[in-house]
From Swiss-Prot:
Residues 1-16 form the signal peptide. Residues 609-632 form the ITAM domain. The chain crosses the membrane at residues 486-506, 627-647, 1104-1124. The gene is GP. It comes from the Viruses. Residues 507-626, 1125-1133 are cytoplasmic. Gene3D superfamilies: 1.10.8.1320. The record marks 646-647 as: Cleavage. Residues 755-775 are annotated as: Fusion loop. GO terms for cellular component: host cell endoplasmic reticulum membrane; host cell Golgi membrane; host cell mitochondrion; host cell surface; membrane; viral envelope; virion membrane. This is Envelopment polyprotein. It comes from Hantaan virus (strain B-1).
Length: 1133
């Protein structure tokens, strides 16, 4: 083992990439009772015959390999060669050579080896060889106890130059076998096979190994002749033993033949009818050529005198195992025949053999493991959210359009746990898990992070900080209103004068600007008038020397005196008496405004009253009376705003918060409702119908419409298979095409085109000089069959809803279909039409558990199906296997001195692979609450993709005299509450509701505090005690949630927890979609004051320390006010 690890560490990267292969072993996440083992295998590239004979398997796995595999096993090696003295090809132109060869680790299992390896916690590693005359392809097999799944994640196996990485993959199956995306548990009882209608049928891959053991109980040839009805003699002296099988890579050993085990019977039947099993072709070897030399007999072992085994010699790519055991000897004569097909046909009595290893599909009866719902939790982590999904029975599918779902799964006890990260929390997180749509409301995560941050900042008083934080962190306007209310109460006596002073300073600044601007405008108007008068009477005010326009007469006289003498009239600086020089000086002169300022001083300003600026200066913002008035007014306004904003914004169409009670409708005319309802939504309508003549007479009306149920009568078409198409050319020089039986003749689906006696000099290999003899057989066959889905054809489809009406004391229910009505004495409820994507004749294909939804096929092949069509390879229930047709044309391609090659111009891609490539072009659908049999499927649509047109008419002709009194009496008691107030997830209130005076009563129970109601549940009460759970969203820290019926509520209420940093549970969309309408009034001003009072009382009763802390802060602000703004002292006159 250490040499293997050292070699693996020293090899280069390129070598490792070229010679490392994967072997994947699927493990369920629970350990079965019994000696359950898991197995896997992998195909390896070819080696030369000499290298193959030196192979020894090695393992670095922490489970020891079974010791018996290290023993040397001897076999009879049979090869063929051309005769040296033959000039033309015929049945005598080649010969066989027998010899003894030894292998270590070849697939020659001993009696009780697998059972001992389970008890001793050892692995069984071995290999098989499929070879021709020059090279062999190894196939490595491994059987380990199921406990290895809990002990290892991966390990390394070495075989010659190759390294096999064994990867233990956890499936989401509890104990079953993963097939078609579902977990299948086979049943070994024969009675289940006889009553197939009661059980499911699945095609499971099985691997079997021949165990040679001399004992009269193991007369396998006798069992074969009995099963085939042959009349062979001397079966007692033939080989004895049995096959040990692992079903689906995960099962306890199955022993064949065994009459009491149906699984063994199916395996034994498969070995007899298709003894070669699945081929060993590597990818790219689907198209290959065989050159058949002919049939020949050999001596097994080579020391016997007579020939006792018939074989067929070939040259080309080896596709089937070269190991077998002679059937004619009870001594266990093992055979290694590279380049020869041994005769495995058991319909003849002599010269045949049995396969050492068999691999193929068998049909078994059993049941599928139930699909359990998921629980999804999320918590904030950095900038995003960290989420976990749990499911009791495993998670078969989990996706999210906005999260990074890892494929590395972990298991915790009997539940599967998958962790994933969501990068964004600015929108709700949507997760599809086990066919259910879960929504994580990230608003609650943000609330929790806010509470955590505030509590951490004020960690000296964690209780007080938490109580304040849960109010401040409510999202939206309500949180800001809470912050404003607390700040005003605690620090308003300091902040009000400070804010008022800041506002006064800003106002005085603008008032000063306005006052200065007005004075300047008045002075400019005076200058303009002076200038206009001067120009009218004496002329221009422009200096003749410097051309400067003067504003006053005094300025003009100064220019006339100074400019002529070359002086500046403003600063008396000497300059050249030219216009250019003087104008340049004016640009830098600092005294050009001298005459303007002198004039401004002589102008007497207009007397202005006190004005805005003076009024602002005189405002007494430090007055205690002013501060008290503003503090009280702000508290009242902010309390009203806080209460009005305390209602949580609803998610349409879930719930609209309203006040207590039920709306009333005066029946002047018939009451008619006409609307469209999504298929996933429930609808509740509740009103009091009042007499238009007498308002005191009323009748209670309650209508409940359940979500849409879809029921389809179907025909079970069976299982759809994926497959690989193989094209093989088989050429032999002489004889008719029917002379040889090729291994693919035993495949479930095959087709052959023969070109008999058509050889010519231009279409012959060099060793086949004959002309007009022999055969070229072009064979098509399907292998690697894998069931991928289950198909149902819709015969008829029905959309229905259950409708219940409570009219007074009258209670009636009915399930109505599309275009159907429910008519009572006073009400008529109709489904006028349904918008749907299902129609008669469609085919529903489920590529996995039916709980995960399926695909709708409008054009599903029904009769003549070609390979590549939907339904090309089908396994119908209780009917023979259906193979596709191959409509393409064959062509025999010939070249001089080469073996002919067959070409096929038809489709070579399976229908399943074509559907996967274009799956986005098909309509899909999700399912919830699905129930199914072979004849009928019923489910509900969780996405609301379908819609019903609903029409409700309530007649105005109501006998109010007799119907006004309702004898039903309802008693209410709040029993328990879970969840949090003010959060996006909400709370669940459990109510104990008692009903007396009538047997049944359809009504609604609400979850309310003193002011408004946050959720309701429509329920049919039975006489006695009833438990009702109501889900609501909203409320505040002071809300005491009660169970209410109409305006009557339970005597006591319960307070929900505060939103915190706990994990947020996902909401099932199917449970979340309901439309409730009872016409109750919205919350008004009185309701707001009730909410404010309830909040204050909640703080006092819940955590009175918070109130003390707030009062201490208020006192501190008053002291600070007296220091910063002391009271003005008035002197005595």
């Amino acid at each position: 083992m250490w040499s293997l690890l050292l070699l693996a560490a020293l090899v280069g990267q390129g070598f490792a990439l070229k010679n490392v292969f994967d072997m994947r072993i699927q493990c369920p996440h629970s350990v079965n009772f019994g000696e359950t083992s898991v197995s896997g295998y992998t195909e390896l590239p070819p080696l030369s015959l000499q290298e193959a004979e030196q192979l020894v398997p090695e393992s670095s796995c922490n489970m020891d390999n079974h010791q018996s595999l290290s023993t040397i096993n001897k076999l009879t090696k049979v090869i063929w060669r051309k005769k040296a003295n033959q000039e033309s090809a015929n049945q005598n132109s080649f010969e066989v050579v027998e010899s003894e060869v030894s292998f270590k680790g070849l697939c020659m299992l001993k009696h009780r080896m697998v059972e001992e390896s389970y008890r001793n916690r050892r692995s069984v590693i071995y290999y098989d060889l499929a070879g021709n005359s020059t090279f062999c392809k190894p196939t490595v097999y491994m059987i380990v106890p199921i406990h290895a799944c809990n002990m290892m994640k991966s390990c390394l196996i070495g075989l010659g130059p190759y390294r096999i990485q064994v990867v233990y993959e956890r499936t989401y199956c509890t104990t079953g076998i993963l097939t078609e995306g579902k977990c299948f548990v086979p049943d070994k009882a024969v009675v289940s096979a006889l009553k197939r209608g009661m059980y499911a049928i699945a095609s499971i891959e099985t691997i079997c190994f021949f165990i040679h053991q001399k004992w009269n109980k193991y007369k396998i040839v006798t069992a074969i002749t009995s099963a085939m009805g042959s009349k062979c003699n001397n079966t007692d002296t033939k080989v004895q033993g049995y096959y040990i099988c692992i079903i689906g890579g995960n099962s306890a050993p199955v022993y064949a033949p065994a009459g009491e085990d149906f699984r063994a019977m199916e395996v034994f039947s498969g070995i007899i009818t298709s003894p070669h099993g699945e081929d060993h072709d590597l990818p790219g070897e689907e198209i290959a050529t065989y050159h058949i030399s002919g049939q020949i007999e050999a001596k097994i072992p080579h020391t016997v005198s007579s020939k006792n085994l018939r074989l067929a010699a070939f040259a080309g790519i080896p596709s089937y195992s070269s190991t077998s055991i002679l059937a004619a000897s009870e001594d266990g004569r093992f055979i290694f025949s590279p380049g020869l097909f041994p005769n495995l046909n058991q319909s003849v009595c002599d010269n045949n053999a049995l396969p050492l290893i068999w691999r193929g599909l068998i049909d078994l009866t059993g049941y599928y493991e139930a699909v359990h719902p998921c629980n999804v939790f999320c918590v904030l982590s950095g900038p995003g959210a960290s989420c976990e999904a749990f499911s009791e029975g495993g998670i078969f599918n989990i996706t999210s359009p906005m999260c990074l779902v890892s494929k590395q799964n972990r298991f915790r006890a009997a539940e599967q746990q998958i962790s994933f990260v969501c990068q964004r929390v600015d929108m709700d997180i949507i997760v599809y898990c086990n066919g259910q749509k879960k929504t994580i409301l990230t608003k609650t995560l943000v609330i929790g992070q806010c509470i955590y941050t505030i509590t951490s900042l004020f960690s000296l008083l964690p209780g007080v900080a938490h109580s304040i934080a849960i109010e401040l962190c409510v999202p939206g306007f309500h949180g800001w209103a809470t912050a404003a209310l607390l700040i005003t109460f605690c620090f308003g006596w300091v902040l009000i004068p400070a804010c008022t002073l800041a506002i006064l300073l800003v106002l005085k600044f603008f008032a000063n600007i306005l006052h200065t601007s007005n004075q300047e405008n008045r002075f400019k108007a005076i200058l303009r008038k002076i200038k206009e008068e001067f120009e009218k009477r004496k002329g221009s005010m422009v200096c003749e020397i410097c051309k400067y326009e003067c504003e006053t007469l005094k300025e003009l006289k100064a220019h006339n005196l100074s400019c002529v003498q070359g002086e500046c009239p403003y600063c008396f600086t000497h300059c050249e008496p030219t216009e250019t020089a003087i104008q340049a000086h004016y640009k830098v002169c600092q005294a050009t405004h001298r005459f303007r300022e002198d004039l401004k001083k002589t102008v007497t300003p207009q007397n202005i009253g006190p004005g805005c600026y003076r009024t602002l200066n005189l405002f007494r913002y430090k007055s205690r009376c002013y501060i008290l008035t503003m503090w009280t007014l702000l508290l009242i306004i902010e309390s009203i705003l806080w209460a009005a904003s305390a209602a949580e914004i609803p998610l349409v169409p879930l719930w609209t918060d309203n006040a207590h009670g039920v709306g009333s409708v005066p029946m002047h005319t018939d009451l008619e409702l006409d609307f469209s309802l999504p298929s996933s939504s429930k609808y509740t309508y509740k009103r009091h119908l009042t007499n238009p003549v007498n308002d005191q007479q009323s009748v209670s009306l309650h209508i409940e419409i359940e979500s849409q149920g879809i029921g389809a009568d179907v025909h079970h078409l069976g299982h759809w298979y994926d497959a690989r198409l193989n094209l093989k050319t088989s050429f032999h020089c002489y004889g008719a095409c029917t002379k040889y039986q090729y291994p693919w003749h035993t495949a479930k689906c095959h087709f052959e085109k023969d070109y008999e006696y058509e050889n010519s000099w231009a279409c012959n290999p060099p060793d086949c000089p004959g002309v007009g003899t022999g055969c070229t057989a072009c064979g098509l066959y399907l292998d690697q069959l894998k069931p991928v889905g289950t198909a149902f054809k819709i015969i008829s489809v029905r959309y229905s809803r259950k409708v219940c009406v409570q009219f007074g004391e009258e209670h009636l229910c009915k399930t109505i279909d599309m275009n159907d009505c429910f008519v009572t004495r006073h009400a008529k409820i109709c489904i006028i039409g349904t918008v749907s994507k299902f129609s008669q004749g469609d085919t529903l294909l489920f590529l996995g558990p039916m709980e995960g939804g399926g695909i709708i096929f409008k054009h599903w092949c029904t009769s003549t199906c070609h390979f590549g069509d939907p339904r090309d390879v089908m396994g119908p229930k209780d009917k023979p296997f259906i193979c596709p047709e191959f409509p393409g044309q064959f062509r025999k391609k010939c070249n001089f001195a080469t073996t002919p090659v067959c070409e096929y111009d038809g489709n070579i891609i399976s229908g399943y692979k074509k559907v996967l490539a274009t799956i986005d072009s098909f309509q899909s659908f999700n399912t919830s609450n699905i129930h199914f049999t072979d004849e009928r499927i019923e489910w509900r649509d969780p996405d609301g993709m379908l819609r019903d047109h609903i029409n409700i008419v309530i007649s105005k002709d109501i006998d109010f005299e007799n119907l006004a009194e309702n004898p039903c009496k309802v008693g209410l008691q709040a029993a328990n509450i879970e969840g949090a107030w003010g959060s996006g997830v909400g709370f669940t209130l459990t109510c104990q509701v008692s009903l007396t005076e009538c047997p049944t009563f359809l009504t609604s129970i609400k979850a309310c505090d003193m002011a408004i109601c946050y959720g309701a549940e429509s329920v049919t009460l039975s006489r006695g005690q009833n438990t009702v759970k109501i889900t609501g969203k909203g409320g505040h820290s002071g809300s005491s949630f009660k169970c209410c019926h109409g305006k009557e509520c339970s005597s006591t209420g319960l307070q929900a927890s505060a939103p915190h940093l706990d994990k947020v549970n996902g909401i099932s969309e199917l449970e979340n979609e309901k439309v409730y309408d009872d016409g109750a009034p919205e919350c008004g001003v009185t309701c707001w004051f009730k909410k404010s009072g309830e909040w204050v009382m909640g703080i006092i009763n819940g955590n009175w320390v918070v109130l003390i802390v707030l009062c201490v802060l208020l006192l501190f602000s008053l002291i600070l006010l007296s220091i910063l703004c002391p009271v003005r002292k008035h002197k005595k006159s």
